């Protein structure tokens, strides 16, 4: 199974970073995970999202 996680912006609070890392460690045992981080500018990245969804 392949999972793509598309994120807008970055996590800024330590609690969220720790929670994400823990969850990621659990998931990567069962699936191939790709994390794509985009800028917070939604309009500027819309074409990139469409391109990623076409895969």
UniProtKB/Swiss-Prot annotation:
Q: Which GO terms describe its molecular function?
A: methyltransferase activity
**According to its UniProt record, what is one Pfam family this protein matches?**
SPOUT_MTase
Looking at the UniProt entry, the stretches that span the membrane are none
According to the record, the signal peptide region is none
Q: Which domain of life is it from?
A: Bacteria
Instruction: Supply the SUPFAM superfamilies for this chain.
Output: alpha/beta knot
Q: Name one GO biological process term.
A: rRNA processing
Q: What is the protein's given name?
A: Uncharacterized protein in ffh 3'region
Species in which this protein is naturally found: Mycoplasma mycoides
């Amino acid at each position: 199974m392949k999972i793509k996680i598309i994120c807008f912006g970055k996590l800024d609070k330590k609690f969220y970073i720790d929670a994400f890392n823990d969850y990621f460690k659990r998931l990567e045992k069962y699936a191939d995970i790709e994390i794509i981080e985009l800028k917070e500018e939604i309009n500027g990245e819309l074409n990139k999202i469409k391109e990623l969804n076409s895969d």
